[in-house]
Amino acid sequence: MTSVYESLLSDYPDKGVIGKPEIRDTETEIIEKLRTLYNHFVQAKQTGKPIFVLIGAGVSTGSKLPDFRGKQGVWTLQAEGKHAEGVDFQVARPGVSHKSILALHKAGYIKTIITQNVDGLDRKVGIPVEDLIEVHGNLFLEVCQSCFSEYVREEIVMSVGLCPTGRNCEGNKRTGRSCRGKLRDATLDWDTEISLNHLDRIRKAWKQTSHLLCIGTSLEIIPMGSLPLDAKSKGIKTTTINYQETAHEKIVETAIHADVKLILYSLCNALGVNVDLGDDLPDEVPIPLKIS
């Protein structure tokens, strides 16, 4: 489970603020805030400037994976000498939140999606890799250091920090050429620099967006935690969805304190976007809120 990821990371004392109290908006407050977010989505479609999305661990709690800084989060409980409970990464399945995000992407409301999660569920649910930035990596991914071919594994790659895994590339699928370059893991350690390619893709995404939506993240760790500040400097407003107060609560336009999947599924319902839930969900489907 998540303890495997914990065990792979090096010791690092500054994990941001942990264990903040949860805030629960009333249904009236949620509906009012949801209307504001709905209007941003409508405008995004009308103007052709899709919503820019940042995903945090709160999106995967519906998949039975713990978050990090919540009341039962990995770092919160670690500070108490305990371990967070959850399913093994290898059996975790995309939940309602992942499938709602995919539906909004398919419908053209959102395009670039940054995920801070290393569980691979955003890729697994079907978000196209060209629009997905796995900014902290993916525990199931190996990358060739020579031709940059990617290999998605069934098992966790048991290292972090972009280290060689001992395997070799099987060849560049795009060109058909043999390679045999060394493979490395694709997950950052605490002190690993974020890929320059990722940072360049983020810079380009700002030019194409009308609004920033931060989902299930406390925004404690930079540089991704500073995205609302970047948005403000560009005249772009931000909405956050998180039970706890985020690091930038006072500068965002709307801070929604409610269940992530309830907001996303209700938003899809209000926009008339069909969510393909399949028949293998790890969590219950919420009753969507009516905003009209």
From Swiss-Prot:
<dbReference type="GO" id="GO:0005635">
    <property type="term" value="C:nuclear envelope"/>
</dbReference>
<feature type="binding site">
    <location>
        <position position="144"/>
    </location>
    <ligand>
        <name>Zn(2+)</name>
    </ligand>
</feature>
<feature type="active site" description="Proton acceptor">
    <location>
        <position position="136"/>
    </location>
</feature>
<dbReference type="GO" id="GO:0046969">
    <property type="term" value="F:histone H3K9 deacetylase activity, NAD-dependent"/>
</dbReference>
<feature type="binding site">
    <location>
        <position position="147"/>
    </location>
    <ligand>
        <name>Zn(2+)</name>
    </ligand>
</feature>
<dbReference type="GO" id="GO:0000122">
    <property type="term" value="P:negative regulation of transcription by RNA polymerase II"/>
</dbReference>
<feature type="binding site">
    <location>
        <position position="260"/>
    </location>
    <ligand>
        <name>NAD(+)</name>
    </ligand>
</feature>
<dbReference type="GO" id="GO:0070403">
    <property type="term" value="F:NAD+ binding"/>
</dbReference>
<protein>
    <recommendedName>
        <fullName>NAD-dependent protein deacetylase sir-2.4</fullName>
        <ecNumber>2.3.1.286</ecNumber>
    </recommendedName>
</protein>
<feature type="binding site">
    <location>
        <position position="163"/>
    </location>
    <ligand>
        <name>Zn(2+)</name>
    </ligand>
</feature>
<feature type="domain" description="Deacetylase sirtuin-type">
    <location>
        <begin position="31"/>
        <end position="292"/>
    </location>
</feature>
<dbReference type="GO" id="GO:0005634">
    <property type="term" value="C:nucleus"/>
</dbReference>
<feature type="binding site">
    <location>
        <begin position="216"/>
        <end position="218"/>
    </location>
    <ligand>
        <name>NAD(+)</name>
    </ligand>
</feature>
<dbReference type="GO" id="GO:0043186">
    <property type="term" value="C:P granule"/>
</dbReference>
<dbReference type="GO" id="GO:0061629">
    <property type="term" value="F:RNA polymerase II-specific DNA-binding transcription factor binding"/>
</dbReference>
<dbReference type="GO" id="GO:0009408">
    <property type="term" value="P:response to heat"/>
</dbReference>
<feature type="binding site">
    <location>
        <begin position="242"/>
        <end position="244"/>
    </location>
    <ligand>
        <name>NAD(+)</name>
    </ligand>
</feature>
<keyword id="KW-0479">Metal-binding</keyword>
<keyword id="KW-0862">Zinc</keyword>
<feature type="binding site">
    <location>
        <position position="169"/>
    </location>
    <ligand>
        <name>Zn(2+)</name>
    </ligand>
</feature>
<dbReference type="InterPro" id="IPR050134">
    <property type="entry name" value="NAD-dep_sirtuin_deacylases"/>
</dbReference>
<dbReference type="InterPro" id="IPR026590">
    <property type="entry name" value="Ssirtuin_cat_dom"/>
</dbReference>
<feature type="binding site">
    <location>
        <begin position="56"/>
        <end position="75"/>
    </location>
    <ligand>
        <name>NAD(+)</name>
    </ligand>
</feature>
<dbReference type="InterPro" id="IPR003000">
    <property type="entry name" value="Sirtuin"/>
</dbReference>
<dbReference type="GO" id="GO:1903863">
    <property type="term" value="P:P granule assembly"/>
</dbReference>
<dbReference type="Pfam" id="PF02146">
    <property type="entry name" value="SIR2"/>
</dbReference>
<keyword id="KW-0808">Transferase</keyword>
<feature type="binding site">
    <location>
        <begin position="116"/>
        <end position="119"/>
    </location>
    <ligand>
        <name>NAD(+)</name>
    </ligand>
</feature>
<dbReference type="GO" id="GO:0005643">
    <property type="term" value="C:nuclear pore"/>
</dbReference>
<dbReference type="GO" id="GO:0046872">
    <property type="term" value="F:metal ion binding"/>
</dbReference>
<keyword id="KW-0520">NAD</keyword>
<dbReference type="InterPro" id="IPR029035">
    <property type="entry name" value="DHS-like_NAD/FAD-binding_dom"/>
</dbReference>
<dbReference type="GO" id="GO:0010494">
    <property type="term" value="C:cytoplasmic stress granule"/>
</dbReference>
<comment type="similarity">
    <text>Belongs to the sirtuin family. Class IV subfamily.</text>
</comment>
<dbReference type="GO" id="GO:0034979">
    <property type="term" value="F:NAD-dependent protein lysine deacetylase activity"/>
</dbReference>
<comment type="function">
    <text>NAD-dependent protein deacetylase.</text>
</comment>
<dbReference type="GO" id="GO:0003714">
    <property type="term" value="F:transcription corepressor activity"/>
</dbReference>
